[in-house]
Regions:
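Helix-to-loop junctions at the C-terminal end of transmembrane segments
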Residues: 14, 112-125, 212
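Intracellular juxtamembrane helix-capping segments at the cytosolic ends
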Residues: 168-181
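Transmembrane alpha-helix termini and helix-breaking/packing motifs in multi-pass membrane transporters
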Residues: 2-25, 85, 89, 203-220
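C-terminal ends and interior cores of transmembrane alpha-helices
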Residues: 135-149
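C-terminal membrane-cytosol helix-exit motif in multi-pass small-molecule transporters
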Residues: 10, 29-48
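Cytoplasmic membrane-interface "Motif A"-like loop-to-helix N-cap segments
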Residues: 122-134
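Hydrophobic core of transmembrane alpha-helices in multi-pass small-molecule transporters
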Residues: 153-168
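Short amphipathic helix-loop junctions that connect adjacent transmembrane helices
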Residues: 81-98
Length: 227
């Protein structure tokens, strides 16, 4: 709900109130600090029956999960960085227009996410992840086609929405990990997975950014390979 109101505020405020990047970043950062302080003093502490381990845990049986997390982080950067940049660089989207796409993604996800959960519960993580990866391959290849065949903005916006929609199936990765992990390993292994995920977030935008200077289409073709 907070994200929904934030998107609406940006869309309306950017045009009607003439908001600036400085105002958005400073106000958002200040609000985040305020919420963090409130949580520090007022958020309840819960005790668990299983005492989690405080050290990072790296186990061989979780290797597939680590690899999937790394690739998931890489694919996420394609959407967050390069797909969004494509909308700005090629089609001239402004802040409120790109935010409108994020708003559409959010609203769709509100209604579709429960259906994804139902699908995963009844058909399993393997099928859900196969659908996600197959769908993202098609989306990334189509992104490349936008530059090769000069396709229009309507298709680009549709692909942008589909891109985010397929990422909703990523929850299958979490339920898969819950099935293969020991209760005491969940917290430390999740920390390792988050670190691995962010390794892709650090290096991939730099490497693909250099590749973008050569050809944006190649970036999306490489992304399809990662998918």
């Amino acid at each position: 709900i907070a994200t929904l109101f934030a998107y609406i505020g940006i869309i309306v405020g950017w045009q009607k109130l003439g908001l600036s990047f400085n105002f958005l970043y400073l106000s958002s950062g200040g609000l985040t600090v305020l919420i963090a302080v409130l949580c520090l003093f007022f958020f309840p502490h819960f005790r668990t029956e299983t005492q989690p381990k405080t050290k990072l845990v790296i186990r061989r049986r979780y290797c597939l999960y680590y690899a999937l997390e790394f690739l998931s982080g890489a694919r996420r950067q394609i959407f967050v960085v390069f797909a969004a940049f494509m909308m700005v660089e090629k089609f001239g989207f402004e802040v409120h227009q790109l935010t409108a796409l994020f708003l559409i993604n959010l609203v769709i996800n509100i209604f579709v996410a429960p259906l994804f959960g139902y699908f995963i519960a009844h058909f399993g993580e393997r099928r859900a992840l196969l659908i996600e990866y197959s769908g993202l391959i098609c989306v990334f290849l189509a992104y490349g086609g936008i530059y090769i065949f000069d396709w229009g903005v309507v298709l680009a916006a549709t692909l942008f929405v589909l891109d985010h929609l397929f990422f909703g199936l990523r929850i299958a990765l979490k339920t898969y990990f819950q099935k293969i992990s020991s209760p005491e390993d969940i917290a430390p292994t999740a920390a390792v997975a988050l670190t691995i995920n962010h390794i892709a977030a650090i290096f991939l935008p730099v490497l693909f950014g250099l590749l973008w200077l050569v050809s944006p289409a190649i970036v999306f073709m490489a992304a399809a390979f990662l998918a």
